[in-house]
């Protein structure tokens, strides 16, 4: 099949005006690539986590006015959905690619995960590379590098999972558009796989919480 690395055209999708026009290009160019990345990495993540991982490509079906500013493929251990579960994502904004482990606001066990992450904070700091990013909102492109956060910053992020209904915690890497465009497909896929190898630690922590 065609390359799984994102191209200038893929990034440019998110500058197209209008919901219908942007969605048309998204469906034709970006979505097949997200599906391809899903098919490529689902067995990798299944092996890393011990859970069978299912692929969920974002459909943006609820949008009626505003076009999406990003798109992604998610991986979760449930065939029917991913938003309530600890999951992984690969996606892109106009400016960069993201690779996340994600706990988002729909999760019914956020409080338990927050407590668990607070308890294992030293392990998380030592297991997650300092160049990785943390985000508190999957709907915004902003994220903070772990090297720029102290222990209290991380503790506050996890505390929000416990106490704030809409709180989220995402961890992973961001690759700028320029970086991605200068990578070979092999290097791009290797970078994502290396990130997942580190992020699997966070997923394995969540497996300690009984559902």
Swiss-Prot record:
Domain of life of the organism encoding this protein: Bacteria
Pfam families linked: DUF1054
Family of this protein: Belongs to the UPF0637 family.
Protein name in the entry: UPF0637 protein BLi01683/BL05149
